[in-house]
């Protein structure tokens, strides 16, 4: 009753009329109150039957998810906007390799700019989708397109670094024309895969949380199964193989070079064969490898849960996919858009230098290093080197 629910210090002035009424907890929902009952009538037609009988989520979850999307979206849009502003203002940073970084920033920026406002709007207004079935299809299409482009670009960045660090001068250099070709291919690839559900192979659907839309990963017909399997192989498994292979050979090449130098130094009875310039070169190589591996590892953390839930829902036990379980991989996948600009800001000394010039109030402190003419090939081709001057366009 209300009397039992009331704290003791207010019972004395709670009117007796209210004592026997049943207490109402606005945060509690009866077990019979399902997602289908909670969904507005205009979205019930495209809410997958798998979700109909699940109990409606606690309202606090919607506010929590809305807050998460607000934080991630704001960080992603602001961070990638700064990256693009830096590249546009300082022409010296626009190397062929950095064009790939720019493409990654464009993809991440557009993804969050297009998706996070409606997610925040839905969740803070109670959860259910408020933009109709067509809006749901567009939302899912944009998420898939920009996500595929991000994956393709990260794969090409890893191959470019493999080509420079492992092959060196024997490798094919990345020219501006090649970089533009790769970027064009990445968008064609992304558009091709993201259009498939719109033309009948696979499908887009509203997620169980009802505030976002993505792939239909709970239908187990052969059309949907074949699409999910093909998309997972082409845009998750294949990139993993390429990326892991590239970084394996990068690390192997660095350690092999170190071993050869130690062996030669031992024969000559000297402590080290390295000059200061060589030491800086190897430090750059190791730093690039570490940062790249960290970037890919975080990308795997973001996209692996989504890949797993898609395979589980279409090929496994779909009953294990609850509305909350379906919400976690979707929001994790979007976190990569927020931390990509942070990783690149940390990994590139010259980016930080230009960032400091553009925003002096950020108090960015750089360690001063000796600059020599004998710069490493890796530094010249894969990072913003000490020779790049931050001169505004």
What are these language model-derived features?
Residues 1-56, 256-289, 294, 349-393:
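Intrinsically disordered regulatory tails of 7TM GPCRs
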Residues 18-21, 25, 44-54, 123-140, ...:
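Loop architecture of class A 7-transmembrane GPCRs
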Residues 58-70, 96-157, 163-172:
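Extracellular TM2-ECL1-early TM3 structural module of rhodopsin-like
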Residues 61-90:
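First transmembrane helix
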Residues 66-72, 110-126, 140, 147-154, ...:
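Helix-to-loop junction signature of class
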Residues 77-88, 109-117, 145-168, 182-184, ...:
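Cytoplasm-facing ends of alpha-helical transmembrane segments in multi-pass membrane proteins
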Residues 153-165, 197-208, 230-269, 291-313, ...:
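Class A (rhodopsin-like) GPCR signature focused on the TM5-ICL3 interface and adjacent 7TM helical core
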Residues 242-243, 301, 307-311, 327-373:
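Seventh transmembrane helix
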């Amino acid at each position: 009753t209300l009397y039992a629910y009331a704290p003791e210090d207010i019972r004395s002035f709670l009117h007796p009329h209210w004592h026997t009424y049943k207490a109402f907890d606005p945060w509690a929902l009866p077990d019979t109150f399902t997602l289908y009952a909670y969904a507005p009538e205009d979205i019930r037609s495209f809410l997958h039957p798998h979700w109909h009988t699940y109990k409606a989520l606690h309202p606090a979850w919607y506010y929590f998810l809305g807050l998460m999307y607000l934080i991630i979206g704001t960080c992603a849009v602001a961070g990638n906007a700064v990256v693009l502003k830096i590249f546009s203002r300082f022409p010296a940073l626009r190397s062929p390799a950095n064009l790939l970084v720019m493409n990654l920033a464009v993809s991440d920026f557009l993804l969050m700019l297009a998706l996070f406002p409606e997610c925040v709007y839905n969740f803070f207004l109670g959860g259910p989708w408020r933009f109709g079935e067509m809006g749901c299809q567009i939302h899912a299409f944009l998420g898939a397109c920009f996500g595929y482009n991000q994956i393709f670009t990260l794969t090409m960045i890893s191959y470019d670094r493999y080509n420079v660090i492992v092959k060196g001068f024997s490798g094919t250099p990345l020219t501006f024309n090649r970089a533009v070709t790769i970027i064009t291919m990445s968008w064609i690839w992304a558009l091709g895969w993201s259009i498939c559900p719109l033309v009948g192979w696979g499908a887009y659907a509203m997620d169980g949380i009802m505030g976002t839309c993505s792939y239909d990963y709970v239908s187990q017909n052969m059309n949907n199964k074949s699409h999910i399997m093909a998309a997972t192989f082409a845009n998750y498994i294949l990139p993993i193989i390429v990326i892991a292979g590239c970084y394996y050979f990068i690390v192997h090449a660095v350690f092999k070079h170190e071993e050869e130098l130690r062996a030669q130094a031992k024969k000559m009875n000297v402590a080290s064969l390295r000059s200061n310039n060589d030491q800086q070169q190897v430090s750059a190589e190791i730093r690039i490898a570490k940062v790249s591996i960290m970037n890919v590892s975080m990308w795997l953390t973001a996209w692996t849960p989504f890949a797993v839930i898609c395979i589980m829902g279409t090929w496994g036990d779909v009953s294990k996919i609850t509305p909350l379980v379906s919400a976690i991989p979707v929001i994790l996948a979007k976190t990569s858009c927020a931390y990509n600009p942070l990783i690149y800001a940390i990994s590139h000394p010259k980016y930080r230098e230009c960032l400091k010039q553009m925003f002096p109030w950020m108090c960015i402190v750089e360690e001063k290093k000796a600059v020599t003419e004998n710069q490493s090939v890796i530094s010249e081709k894969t990072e913003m080197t000490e020779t790049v001057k931050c001169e505004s366009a």
